[in-house]
């Protein structure tokens, strides 16, 4: 049996990046843990906040970037996909970049640096947030791994951008000054090792749940 035949015979699981990390980390929603639920109004406000922050970025920032990967793990073929809130590509030196017309076909050159931006609106005083929420960080790391793999990057950064949804009606200047950022840079090797552990854990748990039923 060749590799393609073996892959075809495996059970295909289609899963979003968000559902993947939530299945493994099993953390409650941050608003639920602080007495607020993800109501339709909150989801609508969260969508507004995403667009507002994204529009404040320059030409080096590309919003709502679809990413997907398919891989074999154990008895399964995982088809993992999601949408990065934003990808920002900056360049060393004075060279100006504008990817507005060719982002999807971009070749990332050696003097460019890529940052995956994950935007989260929460009902919480940002001063009380000392570190990014685990599932949010894991989402960004998944996107970073997929993008780095597909663009042959040695390193890539992730940024978690948090906004308190209670401040959404502030003026643009005050609003953009009321954001909190957490930023990390990873080597591709670090992300590859982490992502492998994530997918192995997922398939093991899925197999265990299947046997139970």
What residues fall within each predicted segment?
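Metal-dependent nuclease catalytic cores that hydrolyze phosphodiester bonds in DNA/RNA
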Residues: 1-109
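Mg2+/Mn2+-dependent nuclease catalytic core
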Residues: 72, 76-188
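Short, structured interface segments
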Residues: 188-202
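Conserved small/polar residues in nucleotide/adenosyl-binding loops
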Residues: 203-210
């Amino acid at each position: 049996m060749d590799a393609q035949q073996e892959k075809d015979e495996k059970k295909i699981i289609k899963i979003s990046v968000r559902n993947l990390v939530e299945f493994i980390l099993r953390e409650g929603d941050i608003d639920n843990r602080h007495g607020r639920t993800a109501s339709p109004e909150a989801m609508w406000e969260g969508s507004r906040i995403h667009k507002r922050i994204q529009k404040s970025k320059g030409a080096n920032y590309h919003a709502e970037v679809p990413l997907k990967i398919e891989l074999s793990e154990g008895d399964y073929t995982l088809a993992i996909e999601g949408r990065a809130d934003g990808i920002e590509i900056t360049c060393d030196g004075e060279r100006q970049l504008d990817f507005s017309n060719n982002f999807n076909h971009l070749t990332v050159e050696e003097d460019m640096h890529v940052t995956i931006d994950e935007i989260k609106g929460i009902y919480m005083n940002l001063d009380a947030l000392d570190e990014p929420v685990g599932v949010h960080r894991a989402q960004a790391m998944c996107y970073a791994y997929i993008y780095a793999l597909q663009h042959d990057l040695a390193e890539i950064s992730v940024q978690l951008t948090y906004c308190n949804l209670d401040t959404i009606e502030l003026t643009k200047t005050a609003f953009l000054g009321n954001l909190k950022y957490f930023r990390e840079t990873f080597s591709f090797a670090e992300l590859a090792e982490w992502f492998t552990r994530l997918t192995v854990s997922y398939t093991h748990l899925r197999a265990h749940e299947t046997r139970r039923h």
